[in-house]
Design a protein with these regions (language model features):
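Conserved pre-motif I regulatory segment
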Residues: 1-36
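Pre-Walker A (Motif I) flank of P-loop NTPase domains
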Residues: 27-34, 56-57, 133-135, 445-446
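Walker A/P-loop
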Residues: 28-50
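ATP-binding Walker
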Residues: 41, 66, 503
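Conserved strand-helix element at the start of the C-terminal RecA-like helicase core
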Residues: 57-69, 86, 139, 277-280, ...
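Short amphipathic alpha-helical segment within the helicase RecA-like ATPase core
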Residues: 69-77, 97-99, 459-463
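N-terminal cationic and glycine-rich segments that engage phosphates or anionic surfaces
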Residues: 87-442, 461, 465, 495, ...
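Conserved helicase ATPase core of P-loop NTP-dependent helicases/translocases
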Residues: 459, 478-501
């Protein structure tokens, strides 16, 4: 099937020329191109047109999960008949394994996996290996981290057809080899159950399952059915059952893998003994022998990913497989907000390696664990075929790759101008801000407020709640899908003010926002440099009444450059509007369009009749963002209580009694929830 773009409008403003230049560049074999597009100029729509023109599988890579969710929703709207995948880290909580030699403290790996995100990851990879070329995968930096061998994953696909001759027992063995588990009681994702001649499979990457009926050694019927109520959806002549996990190891080579692990362990233990490190030698020997026995008996162990090089049959030092290996060689890579995404991709390898080197040096892991890692930047570049950088503020790397040549998209189809920027003193800034918020709320508009720290964001939200202003805060500790829910709330008018730190920036499509207030704008640094100020100010560029207020007591170079660039763009935009007789207008999106742009929520059973299913303001006054995490099982919430108690005790030891009190309240809430779950 070919990509077929569906939109109620046609390219306008600078879009037609940008689409033509980018398409011609790809067809002429250019490796790198840069789209410099201002906020609200329709960069996503431009890229969608380019994808339709070149008809290639596409990876859209961006730097934060909130933006991934928005782009996923937009591409789903543009390409409803094509495959659009969502690929981010599936952890709600992740504490990596680490060792701190100074205090002799070993921190065991701790994590909580979000099953819905895992389902979306599996769905994206399954679609890629299905052979279809009309696929777009929107991903975070998680796509450069190690995954299973795509060849083994593809070999693990079970293809069945009506009338096929295969014994029921043989089919069940195939399911087990594909990492499905048998379960008669709890029919979870990635399990199957057997009732007489019928086998039900709960597909881990879909919302439905397969029901296969046997007649002797022949498949008599294949049906798809709703796993929640068992009702039949339809009949099939053919079906493909993809593996239940991305980490599929070859069973026939397991014994050889274990021998190789033990050989490396012996060599490393001998090295430790030769250098007088007897404690490290004993620690490593005990740990590896235990892991080997676990793998031999159960097929896995805690931290099995540290042995991935052996299971993947890779040579020492070679890169791991990742999502990019699942794409065909001629895929198109679009790096959105490249000024943020490129540095993030570059930094992953170094941080991971420094942590693991300590684990290896002190006998907690084998040297081969260093090969369980994200790609370094050179490896990432080597996998790219053709790349389009997209940013309103491209950095030196993008400009160097394209020889300083950019495709500029400054004029918006809506005729909207960059919002004017006002500078106001920080004295009485809160009173002034409240006056401005009141004006916007009366008009039915929304407001974004950015602070310098997470604590300031939370305190600001509490203050606004106390004076009956409907608000929420959002920062990196708010769960992935909860961030999208909060943005949906803002757009639908359930809340009027959103307070943030560094997430209220790149790419967020919020036409309802007419005021962006930046507190401490003169505190020069990472959060208040030219790129940050430009990106944050751009959130008001989708509204005809957009205004940006810098609360500052002095003019910094970053502030001045931001204002100068804004004035330059406004001049060009005004001239274009006069020439073409365009009157600027806000694009007000319908309720259905808002739900469409945040459609990633709908995969977790989101109920459109109750779209505000997150914590209320009363709870937020006393409980921080991480307290709202949804723990679905008793073991999960017990682990969370233990973790919170440790953090509370540490805060008390550090004499941070406000934080300790907050954590105490959080722990009490979770204990109450645990009691209700056990009742």
């Amino acid at each position: 099937m070919a990509f077929k773009l569906q939109a109620p409008y046609s390219p306008a403003g600078d879009q037609p020329e940008a689409i033509q230049q980018l398409t011609e560049g790809l067809l002429n074999g250019e490796s790198y191109q840069t789209l410099l597009g201002v906020t609200g100029s329709g960069k996503t729509y431009t890229i969608a047109n380019v994808i339709q023109n070149v008809q290639r599988p596409t990876l859209v890579l961006t730097h934060n999960k909130t933006l991934v969710a928005q782009l996923y929703g937009e591409f789903k709207q543009f390409f409803p008949d094509n495959a659009v995948g969502y690929f981010v880290s599936y952890y709600d909580y992740y504490q990596p394994e680490a060792y701190m030699p100074v205090s002799d403290t070993y921190i065991e790996k701790d994590l909580s996996i979000n099953e819905e995100l895992d389902k979306l990851r599996l769905h994206a990879t399954s679609e890629l290996l299905s052979g279809r070329r009309d696929i777009i995968v929107v991903a975070s930096v998680s796509c450069i981290y190690g995954m299973g061998n795509p060849t083994e994953f593809e070999n693990g696909i079970i293809r069945i057809s009506k009338g096929q001759v295969i014994s029921r027992q043989g089919f069940l063995h195939s399911l087990v080899n594909a990492l499905y588990s048998r379960s008669q009681e709890e029919f979870r994702r990635g399990t199957f159950r057997v009732k007489g001649d019928t086998v039900d499979i709960n597909l881990p990457y879909m919302d439905y399952g397969y029901r296969i009926t046997f007649f002797g050694d022949e498949i008599e019927e294949i049906e798809s059915f709703d796993v929640k109520n068992g009702k039949r959806i339809g009949k099939l002549d053919n079906a493909a059952v993809f593996p239940a996990n991305l980490y599929l190891a070859p069973k026939d080579q397991l014994q050889q893998v274990l021998y190789e692990i033990q050989d490396e362990c012996k060599a490393q233990v001998d090295y430790f003994k030769a250098t007088g490190k007897y404690i490290e030698a004993q620690r490593l020997s005990e740990r590896v022998n235990y892991d080997v026995e676990m793998i031999r008996e159960l097929g896995y162990c805690n931290g099995v990913e540290n042995y991935s090089r052996f299971f993947d049959r890779r040579k020492p030092g070679t890169r791991p497989f990742c999502l990019l290996d699942y794409f065909p060689k001629d895929f198109l890579c679009v790096i959105d907000e490249s000024h943020q995404t490129i540095p993030q991709v570059s930094g992953m390898y170094g941080g991971d390696r420094s942590r693991k080197l300590i684990l290896v040096d002190y006998g907690f892991r084998l040297p081969s664990a260093l090969d369980n890692r994200p790609l370094n930047f050179h490896e990432f570049e080597s996998l790219l075929h053709q790349t389009i950088f997209v940013s309103a503020t491209p950095d030196h790397f993008e400009l160097e790759k394209t020889g300083g040549v950019v495709v500029e998209q400054v004029v918006r189809p809506t005729g909207l101008l960059d919002p004017p920027i006002e500078i106001r003193p920080s004295v009485n800034q809160i009173d002034d801000l409240l006056d401005e918020i009141d004006k916007r709320i009366r008009k039915g508009d929304r407001v974004l407020v950015t602070t310098l720290t997470k604590r300031m964001a939370e305190e600001m939200d509490k203050y606004l709640a106390r004076i009956n202003i409907k608000s929420k805060y959002i920062h990196s500790e708010v769960d992935t899908l909860e961030r999208v829910e909060i943005l949906r709330q803002l757009r639908l008018g359930e809340i009027d003010v959103l307070v943030g730190v560094n997430l209220l920036r790149e790419g967020l499509d919020l036409p309802e926002v007419s005021l962006v207030a930046i507190l401490d704008a003169d505190k020069e640094g990472f959060l208040r440099n030219e790129k940050s100020l430009t990106q944050t100010a751009g959130r008001a560029a989708r509204n005809v009444d957009g205004l940006v207020i810098f609360y500052a007591d002095k003019m910094t170079e970053s502030m001045q450059r931001t204002i100068d660039e804004t004035d330059r763009r406004r001049e060009k935009q005004v001239a274009y509007n006069i020439e073409h007789g365009i009157t600027p207008r806000t694009i007000i999106k319908s309720r259905e369009q808002v739900f469409g742009q945040t459609s990633v929520l709908d995969i977790k059973g989101f109920d459109p009749k109750n779209p505000y299913a997150i914590a209320n303001d009363e709870e937020l006054v006393t409980v921080a963002a991480e307290d709202q995490e949804v723990y679905k099982t008793i073991p999960q919430i017990e682990k969370a209580i233990g973790r919170t108690k440790k953090e509370m005790e540490k805060a008390a030891r550090d004499l941070d009694f406000m934080e300790a009190a907050r954590l105490r309240d959080e722990m009490f809430l979770m204990q109450k929830k645990l009691a209700e779950m056990k009742a």
